[in-house]
């Protein structure tokens, strides 16, 4: 995660660091856009806290999160990038009145703005960008059985992570108008595709 943050920091013009509540926020510009970076940590709680801190201190119009995910679709290759069209939880069950993965009182899925997804998918370069569903849960997918269990509920899932849906839910609750997640597919989990 430190490596990812360092790479993103190189994109900023004249970056500065602010420390708030024990967290470092890196501020700068990309062209005319003000950008704030932070490292949230692994898991739903860390990512939700990071999202709340970002919203509280900087009031973003757009929240973009990035990380490394396991590929849930056998057509994906290592280093392909999945851009969320929607996010949901793969480990939530609130009874038969809710969809599997839905938290009671929340949408079943948190949709990303279609225009941003289309822009990301249209980017040209050496890396393939694939739009699709990202599912989040509180455990590493380190076996074929775990991946099969996820795909039984979400056969259309493109990637699996531990943060994207909790950030999307936090943005939904706090009224952040736009959110989407960018995941680089990691080699370790790609090998765990359910066949």
Model features per residue range: what roles?
Residues 1-52, 57-58:
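N-terminal short beta-loop-beta anion/metal-coordinating cradle
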Residues 26-37, 148-154, 186-188:
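Glycine/charged-rich beta-loop-alpha catalytic/anionic-binding loops adjacent to active sites
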Residues 59-64:
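Proline-aspartate-enriched helix->loop->beta-strand connector
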Residues 72-154, 159:
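Mid-sequence, gly/pro-rich, charge-dense loop/helix-turn segments that line enzyme active sites
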Residues 88, 183-187:
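Short connector loops/turns at beta-strand edges and beta->alpha or beta->beta junctions
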Residues 161-177:
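Short glycine-rich, acidic/polar surface loops and turns
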Residues 188-195:
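His/Asp/Glu-rich mid-to-C-terminal helical/loop segments that flank catalytic regions of hydrolases
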């Amino acid at each position: 995660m430190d490596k990812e943050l360092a790479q993103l920091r190189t994109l900023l013009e004249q970056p500065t660091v602010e420390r708030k509540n024990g967290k470092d926020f890196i501020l700068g510009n990309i062209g005319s856009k003000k950008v704030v970076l932070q490292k949230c940590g692994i898991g739903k709680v860390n990512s939700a806290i990071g999202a709340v801190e970002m919203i509280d201190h900087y009031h973003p119009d757009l929240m973009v999160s990035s990380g490394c995910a396991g590929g849930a679709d056998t057509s994906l290759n290592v280093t392909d990038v999945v851009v969320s069209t929607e996010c949901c939880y793969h480990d939530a069950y609130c009874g038969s009145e809710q969809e599997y993965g839905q938290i009671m009182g929340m949408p079943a899925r948190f949709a990303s703005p279609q225009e941003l997804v289309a822009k990301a998918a249209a980017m040209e370069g050496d890396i393939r960008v694939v739009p699709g569903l990202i599912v989040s849960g509180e455990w590493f997918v380190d076996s074929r059985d775990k991946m099969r269990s996820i795909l039984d509920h979400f056969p259309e899932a493109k990637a699996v992570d531990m943060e994207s849906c909790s950030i999307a839910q936090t943005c939904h609750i706090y009224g952040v108008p736009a959110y989407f997640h960018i995941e680089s597919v990691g080699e370790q989990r790609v090998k765990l595709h359910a066949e």
